[in-house]
From Swiss-Prot:
Gene that this sequence comes from: aspS
GO CC field: cytoplasm
GO biological process: aspartyl-tRNA aminoacylation
Assembly and oligomerization: Homodimer.
Site (Important for tRNA non-discrimination): 31, 83
Species whose genome carries this gene: Hydrogenobaculum sp. (strain Y04AAS1)
Alphabetized UniProt keyword annotations: Aminoacyl-tRNA synthetase, ATP-binding, Cytoplasm, Ligase, Nucleotide-binding, Protein biosynthesis
EC number: 6.1.1.23
Intracellular or extracellular location(s): Cytoplasm
Signal peptide span: none
Stated name of the protein: Aspartate--tRNA(Asp/Asn) ligase
Amino acid sequence: MLRDTYIGLVDDSFIGKHVKLAGWIDSIRDHGGVLFIDLRDKEGKLQAVLEESGNKELYDIAKHFKEESVVLVEGLVRRRPSGTENPKIKSGNVELLIERIELLNASETLPFPIDDNVDISEELRLKYRYLDLRRPKFQKAIKTRSKALKITRDFFEENGFYEIETPFLIKSTPEGARDFLVPSRLHPGKFYALPQSPQLFKQILMISGFDRYFQIARCFRDEDLRSDRQPEFTQIDFEMSFVEEQDIMEISEKLLSKLFLELLDIELSTPFKRITYKEAMERYGSDKPDTRFGLELVDLSDIFKNTNFNVFKSAIEQKGIIKAIKINKILSRKEIDNLTEYVKGLGAKGLAWGKIENGEFSSPIAKFLTEEEIKAMLSRLEAKDQDMIFFSADKPKNVYKILGNLRLQLGKMLNLIDESKFAFLWVVDFPMFEYNEEEGRLEAMHHPFTSPKTEDLDKIKYIVDKSDKEDIINIGENIGARAYDIVLNGVEIGGGSIRIHKQDIQKLVFKILNITDEEAAMKFGFLLEALKYGAPPHGGLAFGFDRLMAMMLGFDSIRDVIAFPKTQKGTCLLTGAPDVVSDKQLKELHIKIT
């Protein structure tokens, strides 16, 4: 080894010892005859001192070294002079008196300083990601990620799970997003797909009798990217046989409790709160509600069922709803206009509002409402002086979208969110299907392998043979799924379900989703075949590991907790991927670019 120990591990116990260290020059300062060189490696920093009086030749060479150059140093560890200690670092009581220094590799002038407090464009950061990763906060993030993976593996091993790798080159079975396709050289015209999840393989592992499986799974989805999306990402994936929803939830809570305790020294209160999908939508306008603050939606539909106000009347006649949010502050005209533009961006035609000043309700819509309606509305909202109310009247789906997002916007705007809090929540009792208006059909709310609730199996069998579209939609949207999502601070960090383990039920679900027998056999024939040979009841869950790490460490984007992330356009600025390939490579793959 070139070194005796790590730079950041040198402390009081090394006083009086000669050591050999290797690392980077974090900073270098010339104090006229004395060079102060802060050395750095993965464990931390250490101040080193080179005195001109001790070795002028070495001093004259070292004073020209640049920051971030790599050096090998030897010297004596001594106590720092009284009053110069640095309590912020482990080595803050000591320093290294340099007797020898060797430049292992010089650094050119950096495109940006290695400093957490400097604002750097993300484009520049990702181009020089290896420099960006030297910054303390990203060193901490990647190290914490590594520790989290170890904790996760240890946890599952202690609980009787097997870590089993599933294939990367698989059959294309789209699960919602587009697949990344890989052409086969040996089978011209045929393609592998990269897995969007290990879903089918982990179910087959349960059929194989392994009982408990887990994997730190790499997943790939060719989709439009946002701050919480990457084309390749990591999941903590697990599956269990002979279980019910409660069993999956308990193991999930235990894992999260272990991660939070060991990484953040935070003790989580379990079991986590549970809320049904219906309640989440009605109260918060979202199936992943942020429960760190109030501003719940209030239903006013019954109050305005006989109203003459055309906007509300039209909504009721079209089987819509009327809901409102109340805040304890009267906003300025400019703030109201900004919120109006915001909800218009979500598809709203406008934003109806009202306020209470000096005990009087005033609103642009007040003249269309009766005194009885206003009185009943204010009573339902428990409104008082200096309160403001925002309304939405439309189909339930649209109202929830508008008010759910408006609620979050108001929460941030009014500083109602406690950013130091971790609010966990299980959302349960999801519908099995939802209606896709564009395609005019039912689609799976989670995925087609989710088991329906036992009490709704007859509905599944009933609508398969129905031809009346409205009947199919009405019944289909009221079939419950044995699905569950885990939400943290308004972000879904994991989701799962009890799976279908009987072939006949799986075939019926495929039919409801307009997947023909031929298409099902072509895409999922291997699963249907496996379900014939004694498949046990089973279920599982997958955590979005990148997202979980970002939230635990206080980052807004998952890109900050991934060593080499892609941009929002799916490019790697470090390597230049994706890129063109040679004609020879394309020819071998029997591919022509047009």
